[in-house]
Amino acid sequence: LSEALNKNIFTPLDRQAVLDKIDQEEEDLGSAQILEKHYHSLRPSIETTLHALMRHRFVAHAHSVNVISYAVLKDSKAILNEKLKGIKWLWVPYVRPGLPLTKMLNKMDVSDYDVIILANHGVVIGGDTKEEVLDIFKQVETRLCRPVRGNFLETEKSKLESLVDSLDYKLPKHDLTHSLARDDLLLEIIGKNALYPD
């Protein structure tokens, strides 16, 4: 991912070959047909099988903070039913990513859905065009957007600047980052357990 802005990091695969691997319950896609030879050094994502189950021409997978903030809640399905009315979406309980998740989804009819929300994990969105995927993603993000917590004052930032002045550290660019590090509730949550394992 470190080169994603400068290079094409996607591995084009034969979708039918991937679907055949799903039927054979094989997790390793290394032998699925790679469509362009110069991509042979890249490995397909562990979640390729999940994406292949969707009928859409374009599929995007995101670990959206807004989506995850709901996907970790015990009553998230009920809340999301209300917030995502009018969008064809599916709730999927937590299962380890890769073949176990794909096997579960293969038993469900995912072809009717444009949005799949994975508990404790993220969201998968499908569309017939890139623009359609982006539009659906924006709708989901807008509906699930949460207010920003915390208030970082400029005077506090100047104190931090004086502390790091003689060190090799740089302060984060955005004030919001400082707010996150000073929020008592967030510090309590992060001190317990990881909210989403994958």
Q: Across the structure, where does each feature detected by a protein language model lie?
A:
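Glycine-rich flexible loops
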Residues: L1-D198
